[in-house]
Amino acid sequence: MSAPGEPGAAPAPAAVPPPGDAALEARGLTKRYRGGQLAVDRLDLRVPRGSVFGFLGPNGSGKTTTIRMAMGLIEPTSGTVEVLGEPMPRGVRRVLPRVGALIEGPALYGFLSGRDNLVRFDAADPTADPRTRAARVGAALDRVGLVAAAGKKARAYSLGMKQRLGLAAALLRPRELLVLDEPTNGLDPQGMREIRTLVRELAADGTTVFLSSHLLDEIEQVCTHAAVMAQGRLLVQGTVAELAGRAASARGRLAVTTPDPADAVRILKEHGVTDLVAAVDRVTGELPGRDAPDLADLNAALVGAGVRVRAFGRERVSLEDAFVALTGEGFDVAG
């Protein structure tokens, strides 16, 4: 564990990302621990500048190991990773002043207050002007909602409060890149919403945010781009809209709102719709992958059979649908 900002049969690999202006770029990045455990396997990843990038996968999929290599905390077995155009870990001294990071939870001095912890972190930055330290610390506390608890000893903080304090430490100075590993871990729903709002504000100010999470809701609500890992390998990456769009064509789920669900089920079944689920006033089903009926013709068939159609169309595809369709695996959804 380190303080914020401190150095310290599987699917085929995803396609190598194209060159360009990236805040973080990995090529063939691999980490094998002693004993042969392969934690990250030939990872090719590109995080565009200005994006809010969601790094998604089940616990143990290699996300944190990837972040630790990117931040220079551990060396890769093979492959390369660049952060803000600098090779890591060689460029760590040039890169870290431009990066805020919260990895595996903050390392705090339990005997110090929240405010004094931030003072210590700020004093450790050789570029920080001591004359404006108090203002920076106060602004960081205010931004994460810890002003009222600033005088309390850190050991008395809840897990969620410690997460907030670690995030405040990462925000003591303006950063080009903010790396957050499970930033809402331990927070209540209100705290989660506040952190997500803060991430959006930082992105609006021009900060690239790299957000690791196992919560689909978290990625879907705040991210512009996403990548998903499983068992140390990258399965897919792209914009959130692209991933959802790919799943939409794969799933083809139809939804009909009607007060006549039984009749709707009968007609839809006759036209090849499968996996039909009927509720009080709604029917959903899967359109066939091949020779699917035209949606307009299907709607006309329902109306022609006397079914009162109130709404008709494809369901909105969530990021959960996208990743299940693309990877065949589920993730935690609630956030």
Regions found by a protein language model. Give the residues of each.
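ABC-family P-loop ATPase nucleotide-binding domain
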Residues: 1-32, 329-335
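C-terminal coupling/interaction segments
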Residues: 2-9, 290-335
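ABC transporter nucleotide-binding domains
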Residues: 21-26, 31-230, 236
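A generic structural signal for secondary-structure junctions
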Residues: 100, 123-126, 245-249, 269, ...
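Residue-level "edge-of-site" marker
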Residues: 154, 281, 315
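ABC transporter nucleotide-binding domain
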Residues: 196-289
